[in-house]
Amino acid sequence: MGYLYYLLHPYQLRSIIQWKVWHDPVHERDPSTESPELQECFRYLNLTSRSFAAVIQELNHELLVPITLFYLCLRGLDTIEDDMTLPLEKKIPILRNFHTTMNEDGWQFHESQEKDKELLEHFDVVITELKKIKAPYHEIITDMTRKMGNGMADYAENEEMIKNGVQTIEEYELYCHYVAGLVGEGLTRLFVESELANPKLAERPSLTESMGQFLQKTNIIRDLHEDWQDGRRWYPKEIWSQHVDKWEDMFNPAQQTKAIECVSHMVLDALKHSEECLFYMAGIKDQSVFNFVAIPEGMAIATLELVFRNPEVLKRNVKITKGDACKIMFECTQNLFTVCEVFKRYTRKIAKKNDPRDPNFLAISAQCAKIEQFIETLFPKQDPKKLTLTQAQAQNKEPTMDAGEAVVLFGVVIAALVCISGLMLGTAWFFGARFDHIFREASVFLPGREKATPMITGHEEL
């Protein structure tokens, strides 16, 4: 991207500078303490990974080497699977037995034509370092490689899927499980084994699965045009057939509106994993591990917003800008709250771009609202406008008394009545009023007193 772009978009340049200047790695790798073989492993990590190399090398030293080797093993496996020049009768046994082959001293593979073939040609350095890590870590890496290798072999043998593409959403999610869900499972086991994550994460496989599904589905949605050119079709027919009659119509300019609606449908399917991804990240204890899992998820939600209702995704492989990537990385290396803010920001952008004419308009709007509602349960906060209104209403409201104030007020009223009554009686007595007759007449009503007999003064008895 040229200088002119950054002159026209200074905020992009600001984000890049902010990341370069202010980002402080939690842990730094020390090459001086590494063996020549391990240094070679990190060189291949940098060669084969653009997205994960930097963040892996900032991991806690307890997991730095195990996760690097785990990545290289899976990258080697993936290189063999992607190599279309290898005949199936040769590829399938390698995939199914890779978990044992990667423990054979000196093993190398020189028949691949893929871009990452150099890793396989010098895979013996990975094997050497694998034998040095702790036994529990080695066991986890071997087990995950076995599961993934068998899953890849199953798909390689599935001629129907290779010819006609993925048919159902269930098949689509099973594929995502093998290529990404298993990676998440292995990483979670490593996090828990190293005591850098809440052990309860190991008991919630759905959370781990959502982390992998969210990333892989995002990649598949974004790589639509590239996969089509390579003869691959990962969009499930169960989804695209609701919008176009033939797969080729997705790239027909006359069918662009329908194709965009299909991509929107795929984005909706990916967004359903958002809440569980955020919940998973809440279980990470170590900051470097949190950065490792949060950065890809932040990039994924930004990528979904980029491809949503974007016709360019039908013509080329679109990517978020370097400035946006640096801004997201800076925010995702803080804490869960800032990650939630990233998700909220891009979710709102998706909701804003949503088109009422889209068949999934209501479902997409509801899913975006659901994500925001979930974030609100994690970090509830009051609306300043509502808070100001509540305070104003409280000030205008009649003051209320508590029990103590009521007793005091009652006592004051009684005392006032007594004083006023005493003053009136004293005034009457001063002016000659006689109260003794009143008291004498009233005394006859007291117990033990006889009532006075009235004197006869008239002739009423006659």
From Swiss-Prot:
One of its GO terms (biological process) is ergosterol biosynthetic process. The keyword Transmembrane helix applies. Its EC number is 2.5.1.21. It is a single-pass membrane protein. The keyword Endoplasmic reticulum applies. One of its GO terms (molecular function) is squalene synthase [NAD(P)H] activity. Pfam families: SQS_PSY. It comes from the Eukaryota. InterPro entries: Isoprenoid_synthase_dom_sf (IPR008949), Squ/phyt_synthse (IPR002060), Squal_synth-like (IPR006449), Squalene/phytoene_synthase_CS (IPR019845), Trans_IPPS_euk-type (IPR044844), Trans_IPPS_HH (IPR033904). Pathway: Terpene metabolism; lanosterol biosynthesis; lanosterol from farnesyl diphosphate: step 1/3; Steroid metabolism; ergosterol biosynthesis. The chain crosses the membrane at residues 406-426. It is found in: Endoplasmic reticulum membrane; Microsome. Its cofactor is Mg(2+). Keywords: Endoplasmic reticulum, Lipid biosynthesis, Lipid metabolism, Membrane, Microsome, Steroid biosynthesis, Steroid metabolism, Sterol biosynthesis, Sterol metabolism, Transferase, Transmembrane, Transmembrane helix. SUPFAM superfamilies: Terpenoid synthases. In Fusarium, the biosynthesis pathway of the sterol precursors leading to the prevalent sterol ergosterol differs from yeast. The ringsystem of lanosterol in S.cerevisiae is firstly demethylised in three enzymatic steps leading to the intermediate zymosterol and secondly a methyl group is added to zymosterol by the sterol 24-C-methyltransferase to form fecosterol. In Fusarium, lanosterol is firstly transmethylated by the sterol 24-C-methyltransferase leading to the intermediate eburicol and secondly demethylated in three steps to form fecosterol. This is Squalene synthase ERG9. It comes from Gibberella zeae (strain ATCC MYA-4620 / CBS 123657 / FGSC 9075 / NRRL 31084 / PH-1) (Wheat head blight fungus). The gene is ERG9.
